[in-house]
Amino acid sequence: MAPRKRNRHALGFLCCFGGSDLPEINLKDNNPLQFLDFTVPIPPTEELNARFSELVDELDLTDKNREAMFALPPEKKWQIYCSKKKEQEDPNKLATSWPDYYIDRINSMAAMQTLYAFDEEETEMKNKIVEDLKTALRTQPMRFVMRFIELDGLSCLLNFLKSMDYETSESRIHTSVIGCIKALMNNSQGRAHVLAHPESINIISQSLRTENIKTKIAVLEILGAVCLVPDGHKKVLQAMLHYQVYAAERTRFQTLLNELDRSMGRYRDEVNLKTAIMSFINAVLNAGAGEDNLEFRLHLRYEFLMLGIQPVIDKLREHENATLDRHLDFFEMVRNEDDLELAKRFDLIHIDTKSASQMFELIKKRLKHTDAYPYLLSILQHCLQMPYKRNGGNFQQWQLLDRILQQIVLQDERGDDPDIAPLENFNVKNIIKMLVNENEVKQWRDQAEKFRKDHAELMSKLEKKERECETKTQEKDEMMKTLNKMKDKLQKESLELRQARDQMNDLVAQLNEYSQGGSISFPAPPPPPPGGPLALSSALSSALTSENLPPLPPPLPFSSCPPPPAPPPPPGGPPPPPGAPPFFSLGVPPPSTTTFSSAGTSLKKKSIPQPSHPLKSFNWAKLSEERIHGTIWNEIDDLKAFKVLDLEDFEKMFSAYQRHQKEMGSTEDLYLSTRKVKELSVIDGRRAQNCVILLSKLKLSNEEIRQAILKMDEQEDLAKDMLEQLLKFVPEKSDTDLLEEHKHEIERMARADRFLFEMSRIDHYQQRLQALFFKKKFPERLAEAKPKVEAILLASKELIRSKRLRQLLEVVLAFGNYMNKGQRGSAYGFKVSSLNKIADTKSSIDRNITLLHYLIMIFEKNYPDILDIQTELQHLPEAAKVNLVELEKEVNNIKTGLKAVEAELDYQKRRIRESGDRFVPVMSDFITVASFSFSELEDLLNDARDKYAKALKHFGENEGKMQPDEFFGIFDTFLQSFAEAKQDLENMRKKKEEEERRARMEAMLKEQREKERRQKKAKAGSISEETGEFDDLVSALRSGEVFDKDLSKLKRNRKRSGNQGLETSRERVVTKLNY
């Protein structure tokens, strides 16, 4: 497609936005022009230009018109400005100065015309309303147009067009409504709004059906102008397709050609309509896609030629109208140029497009020796086979073929259609790509399928290798950690062993010396290490106190075997002296003989202030004095808190005188239907079917599964969940016996039977499978248990160490003793469960305030550090979720599993291994690492138990009666309530501050209004009327309040000068097509 350079002046008459000359500024008014005697002098040039610029901006003029306006002399500018302002301030025009009025009236007109027909007087009145709107859209400031758009005035006009009856459509009202849309489109913002509306152009095109000639002309001018707007050309073509359906046309543009050809009655001499139609046709042909696309112009022009436009053009020449003739000349001129350009492609001067034989010869000549020629023959051959009837029936197949060819010619490389008339959503480019080479595509498809399978297989292998690598890496890291810990432990124990050996050698030397009769002085031995050396050292120490000791054998050289135990002391030896440590004493000094008891020691009597009147009671659980010793309550002195607490305020606040069921979705068992073949099956049918389902998921042969189990799945073929499922299908003894009876028919066995038979041949298959599953599951189980143990340990430490918690309990104890009397009062401590009862005590003054809220207010005032208590107790939420019984049960299960693996490992070490069996080396490494990791978990659990027991004792709670989830849950719930109460107080403060701010603002506004009222009253009459109006007008103009209702009312009440203003109007009409 070769673009054709064209003289842009040839399209000049199509443009609806003016020519190249500067426009002439015309002033229109209903009254004749007269000179005005302005009382307000012309302002300085700078101020005048600023005001005039605001006025010109409101008019939304084109650049050329703006230049012409600014080129006016200052006196003319000031005259235009004052005239426009006078018009805006006219009291008679205020009601119609906003589009709301017009939109409401037109909506009511649309509703009323469906109820009854208008008489002539009503029609005239309605037409005047629409005409006034048209004038307002042309002459009112830009804000009027924007307000009209914001109020969806366009939809109001379009709805009127859609709903009007026949009489209205033939009346002047129809013409005026189209004129309103035309006026709106003369504004840049309005034009963009109309084009953006999805149905506007379609609805406008429906007005072509009227018999009103003026309406037809206005519609054609709009459609012709839209063709010249970016993205407008395609909308016009779509609108003509819409009109074809709306008007039941046989083909597109049929109505236009009929109107162009009509020469009877009032249409005989109606040159304006025919001129408008021809200008529209030229715009459709030469704008948009037709500007540079020869194929599009030929395509669309052929559509008009098929409708018979050429004889109509010849007939239109009889009118001898210069303007119409220019349109006709332009149509034929462009047609001749396009025909010549098409002929040049075939090296001809002219192509007779009416001759089928000539066109066929040209196509045949061009394609004769090309690869496309066979397809031309195929097309012709299939055309011969198309259905044929003498009466012209079955023409739709030919029509479809024609439209497909049209689409092929018109659609560009991007797949965009300049005209959707032939076939919508028909992408030629994609179809051509599909038909490039069917054999090649099939070959590529087969090759792609092969690549896809290879890719899937490689991805499967890669995933398997990645799993294997990840597992090996984890095992290596775990083994390195364990090895480092073992090295540290070995160095520590080697040092302890060396010290114990040195000590033992010293003792042996001393014994030898003693046996020779010397006196022995024993130095104080160092604290013995744990384990064997401790027992030996203790035994020797107690043996030294007896007589007639037999000589000890010489010390053995260091070896991995433990030394033999020392001989027991002879009977009859003296008993150990009083106060001597027991045999396995760890050197801990004996407990003090001073014991705490209520009889032995007395707690200092508390001097608690007494309230002036009864208070609400705090429902706590008081600890007995016997249980105070050794707890946190020993360190708390609530009497110190009374020194800083405001007890009087507290009395006012708390006076006694006031008031999953988890929905189990029904699970359906899945059964796979298997082919009924003659195969041997001795296993239970349902069990065999489930086994087949599992094997199909594994995607491994029996031999691959067997090798994976023998090699302990070093290549990670078996996932944890698959191993768990395999454990459900371990061959039972009854299954094995039955399968053994038919082992000679192994080839006929069903898949499940053969699998179970082959697995039963593996020695200790079940134990191997269980050991492998335990090995894979061990890191996960350890990772789940360890954080729970750590949570209990850390939470216990945090509770014991928290200083903020100690302070909080001190204040709560003080308030509780102040509130409670009798048996509930004078407490030295309370149970921790009482913390969650603090929020149950509500204030007598404000029911929204609880004792917990009050405590937080006290903390904010006197103990601000307590407010951050949660930072000291970060592990409480996790610890509150731990069930110690379940945790210990899980740890014991892990321990049992480890013992079972060790037992199986011992068995496998004793038997002769078959080739490829990797159980012993793999599980030996695993047991080494797992045993050490588990011992760490056990030690951590023991530490957590001890710390938890200390925490219970620290708070005076009974050991064994409260589980961690309950104990830590109490504190966790309290901290949550604490945080919620803090947020409540914050919200209350914000609400109170907002109310106070609002009250202050109202008071300030009231005071300001009163002040302004007094000032106005004081200054009344002091300023001249003219000066006040001038200042108010300038201020309102600059602030954009010039059209405010209050200001307008103010100006109407003032006396104005009797000057007549000049009115400017901005007639931005669509230029008629002319030269």
Curated annotation (Swiss-Prot):
Query: Where expressed (tissue)?
Result: Expressed in progenitor populations of the embryonic spinal cord (at protein level).
Where do Basic and acidic residues bias regions lie?
Answer: 1064-1075
Give a yes or no for keyword Amino-acid biosynthesis in this entry.
no
Keyword Nucleus annotated: no
Sorted alphabetically, the Gene Ontology BP terms of this entry are:
actin cytoskeleton organization; dorsal spinal cord development; negative regulation of oligodendrocyte differentiation; positive regulation of canonical Wnt signaling pathway; regulation of canonical Wnt signaling pathway; regulation of non-canonical Wnt signaling pathway; Wnt signaling pathway
Q: Which residues form a coiled coil?
A: 437-517
Q: Which UniProt keywords apply?
A: Actin-binding, Coiled coil, Wnt signaling pathway
Low complexity: compositionally biased ranges: 533-544
Q: Which PROSITE patterns match?
A: DAD, FH2, GBD_FH3
Where is each DAD domain found?
Answer: 1025-1075
- What InterPro entries is this protein classified in? ARM-like, ARM-type_fold, DAD_dom, FH2_Formin, FH2_Formin_sf, FH3_dom, Formin_Homology, GBD/FH3_dom
- Example of a GO MF term: actin binding
Q: Name one Pfam family in it.
A: Drf_GBD
Cite the FH2 domain residue spans from the record: 605-1075
The record's comment about this protein's domains reads: The DAD domain regulates activation via by an autoinhibitory interaction with the GBD/FH3 domain. This autoinhibition is released upon competitive binding of an activated GTPase. The release of DAD allows the FH2 domain to then nucleate and elongate nonbranched actin filaments.
So what family is this one in?
Answer: Belongs to the formin homology family.
Function noted in UniProt:
Key regulator of the Wnt signaling pathway, which is required for various processes during development, such as dorsal patterning, determination of left/right symmetry or myelination in the central nervous system. Acts downstream of Wnt ligands and upstream of beta-catenin (CTNNB1). Required for canonical Wnt signaling pathway during patterning in the dorsal spinal cord by promoting the aggregation of Disheveled (Dvl) complexes, thereby clustering and formation of Wnt receptor signalosomes and potentiating Wnt activity.
Instruction: Specify the protein name.
Output: Disheveled-associated activator of morphogenesis 2
Highest classification ranks of the organism:
Eukaryota, Metazoa, Chordata, Craniata, Vertebrata
